Regions:
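Helix-hairpin-helix/helix-loop-helix acidic hairpins
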Residues: 1-33
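Charged, low-complexity, helix-prone segments enriched in Lys/Glu/Asp/Gln
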Residues: 3-8, 12, 101-104, 115, ...
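Catalytic phosphate/metal-binding cores of nucleic-acid and nucleotide-processing enzymes, i.e., regions
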Residues: 5-17, 62-64, 71-76, 158-168
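Phosphate-backbone recognition surface of nucleic-acid-processing proteins
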Residues: 23, 37-131, 136, 145, ...
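Amphipathic alpha-helical surface "interface" segments used
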Residues: 115-121, 160-175
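Basic, amphipathic alpha-helical segments enriched in Lys/Arg and hydrophobic/aromatic residues
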Residues: 126-162, 171-174
Length: 176
């Protein structure tokens, strides 16, 4: 067996011991390798934190530009000498997760298409931007569910997701 195969096999055995693996294993599009990529960079849930702490770490928070536009932070928009406030590997790995969720065409893909269709109607001038916005909203929903499942698996009473706790929404899309 070559080094790559041995490494993957070891990675699969380790991720299956992770507290959130039973939940992740039910998500269409998430396998041991994809889960390992993601879980290797995420901190364990805490009672005083919510999934928004993961959003911040991945740079999935919205900023306002000088032109009044909303967007996610990007390296090519940093001022000279300014440091990123997010971890680029987390975002890259979440992009891989999102691509896998899209290819699997499960619950999260359905959510993505609903959001994208709504954005096309609400913002017909956005053209290619609707994919990006819907994609990262899908990732954030997945992260909220993952955070909740992981906290529950460890017996932690995690905070409610931001849309419920702060914005006063009554429900959030659930996968199962």
């Amino acid at each position: 067996m070559d080094l790559e195969a041995t490494t993957e096999e070891t990675m699969h055995e380790i991720v299956k011991l992770h507290p959130v693996w039973p939940w992740l294993n039910q998500v269409k599009g998430i396998g041991p390798q994809t889960a390992s990529l993601m879980l290797g960079y995420l901190l364990s849930p805490r009672e005083d934190k919510g999934p928004s702490s993961w959003y911040k770490a991945a740079g999935l928070y919205v900023i306002q530009t000088d032109k009044g536009e909303s967007r996610l932070p990007r390296y090519d928009h940093l001022e000279k000498g300014e440091k990123a406030t997010w971890h680029p590997r987390i975002r890259r790995n979440l992009y891989v997760v999102g691509t896998s969720l899209m290819k699997a065409k499960g619950f999260y893909y359905d959510f993505y298409t609903e959001v994208k269709d709504a954005l096309k109607i609400k913002h017909p001038d956005w053209k290619g931007r609707t994919h990006s916005v819907a994609f990262w909203k899908m990732i954030k929903l997945f992260l909220a569910h993952c955070y909740e499942a992981w906290a529950e698996a460890e017996g932690i009473k995690a905070r409610e997701p931001y849309p419920i706790e702060i914005l006063g929404h009554r429900k959030i899309a659930r996968p199962h």
